[in-house]
Design a protein with these regions (language model features):
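Conserved mixed alpha/beta catalytic, RNA-binding, or beta-rich assembly cores of soluble enzyme
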Residues: 1-11, 20-361
């Protein structure tokens, strides 16, 4: 692609590789039965609670299927009106119409249906209460509550199925009397009968592969990015930065869904991508620090301000509006938006000139 496009590579250009390519090249797959066996070994007999799962067939249906097979009885506690990343179980407008303006009450499945009537996801049309109950079969009941400790009224053994708040909820449940709590990163964090696994993230970041199989988040990614950087340097003579990326960290302004269903945007990256930008706001500088200068004089004045800027602009007026986010979160989101989630066929993204600024010649 570089040769055909006559692209001139430079130091600090970035090669981003989607996690799916890495995971598939590793053969990092597992089955629903692998999950069931691991859950049974870790949770034992009796009733198990599952709190705050994401509302997604791609992300959670096979995980739930495996959990259900590994448990005698299951109680699923859903948050409402949204899951953790903003997927709506039911329209918030519908709840407002029913007079529900705060969400601190606990409902049984029957009570919730009586309150809202038909449940329908605004985009897919699915009723996720029905979807998840059908996946689990007869040994399942569903409650709705936004308090993670509600589940302890039903069982003291809990799987915290949330993604980004899992550690906080696990700690809270244990402090409030839970006997056993695991999170999704503790399921398949080792191989079961030769299955794939991820020692750091377990089944977090996994995707549905077939009705009985999941593709797991890739492992050994730190080694992969270092080897890729070394090989690219040998071939091109340029020291590029490399990263593996999954979901971007952006929020859909129409649907209100935060797209980050993976545990992290980037599980591994080379050292040059560590840190956050340290930038000044050009609009602020232009309005406040260059006076009546115009044209070339204004341009040179702004470049001088950039070149002399402090190494830490935190809480300084010149940095207003430049919220510092990690390079890997920004770049991974850029790569994910570029590659898309469907049939673009762009599993590798080249990003050039990202670290340039206005003062660079």
């Amino acid at each position: 692609a570089v040769k055909e496009g006559k692209i001139k590579l430079k130091d600090r250009d970035i090669v981003a590789v989607t996690e799916a390519v890495v995971a598939k090249s590793q053969g990092n797959f597992a089955t629903v039965d692998d999950i069931a066996k691991d859950v049974r070994e870790k949770m034992g007999e009796g009733t198990v609670g599952v709190i705050f799962p994401i509302l997604s067939r791609n992300r959670f249906s096979n995980i739930l299927k495996g959990i259900a097979r590994g448990c005698d009885n299951l109680i699923i506690q859903l948050s409402y009106p949204f899951d953790e990343v903003g997927n709506p179980l039911v329209s918030i407008d519908k709840l407002y119409e029913k007079g529900v303006t705060n969400f601190n009450k606990t409902y049984t499945e029957k009570q919730f249906y009586k309150l809202v009537g038909k449940i329908e996801h605004p985009f897919t049309g699915l009723d996720y209460i029905d979807v998840y109950k059908k996946i689990c079969g007869e040994n399942c009941r569903i409650i709705l509550s936004n308090d993670p400790t509600t589940i302890l009224k039903y069982t003291k053994k809990v799987i915290s199925a949330d993604i980004h708040s899992r550690h906080r909820n696990k700690d809270l449940l244990l402090k409030r009397g839970a006997k056993k709590v695991i999170t999704l990163d503790e399921i398949l964090n080792h191989s079961i009968n030769g299955s794939g696994y991820n020692e750091e993230f377990g089944v977090l970041g996994s995707n549905l592969s077939t009705d009985e199989k999941l593709k797991l988040f890739p492992r050994d990614t730190k080694t992969f990015v270092k080897q890729l950087q070394k090989r690219l340097c040998e071939v091109s003579g340029v020291k590029m930065e490399c990263m593996v990326y999954g979901d971007g960290a952006f929020k859909d302004p129409v649907g209100g869904i935060w797209e980050l269903a993976d545990p992290v945007v980037s599980p591994a990256y080379t050292s040059g991508l560590t840190g956050t930008p340290n930038e000044i706001k050009l609009k602020y500088v232009a309005d406040n620090q260059i006076g009546d200068l115009k044209g070339k004089a204004a341009e040179e004045a702004i470049k001088e301000i950039i070149n002399k800027k402090s190494k830490n602009l935190k809480n300084q007026n010149v940095s207003l509006g430049t919220t510092p986010r990690r390079y890997t979160d920004l770049l991974g989101s850029l790569a994910d938006l570029t590659s898309g989630s469907g049939d673009k066929g762009t599993p590798i993204v080249l990003i050039t000139g990202y670290f340039n600024n206005y003062a660079d010649e």
